[in-house]
């Protein structure tokens, strides 16, 4: 990993700039959220809100508008670039629990060599959307969420910095999460962090498979366009926030199925039983899996434990993790 010169919002504008991720809302919701707020980052991340409604969200005009909006915010000094390469410490606090990570740039070569492990397949349409967004804006507008097996030395550096330095931002975002950020602007500290991370075997993508795949493809395109590249150019890296495993809270990721696709209850359960061993719950609260390849299912007012049968999954899918 390495430090970089981030573009950061002015202190008095940070709460107006800050917004929810682009993929948790549709265009109409985003338009309502930015009403009266020209500083919202949604003008960059969902720039179709500033175009006529009949324009497709994947039209070239959308990406050009994102670039235009970002460049205007920079020229209007909504964002100021740090004068020297820094790393950043990012802390989130929700429901009394905090997690703290390091914001830095990560090499696309680590992604290509599988030093950065993936656990999801990606959709080509979503990849193309993020590819165009990064390519047109010439910017990583959202970090990849990575994790690693914690190192005591990194924990100590982060703890020392956050206890002895004043955060540059500290506010509560619209979803109720406290957002606290420190700027790590001392070269000896960023160099030490880079050296420690260089000895870590693997990083793991917790969130951002489409964004990372797209950023890597943009980097490879820029390499083709610049055959004399030396590897130090910014397109060889992508923005990431890296959390240690001992500070990471993995939230439930559930799916709601609208109907049983014409199956009766018994027919549906029979089909599920082809791939899973089913155990009815005891009726007390939600079933939360505690071991691999085990799932909870809530159907017709009752919880069930599903355990994947041998042969129902591809062992090769585990290689990357």
What name fits each language-model region?
Residues 1-320:
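Surface-exposed, charge/polar-rich loops and edge strands
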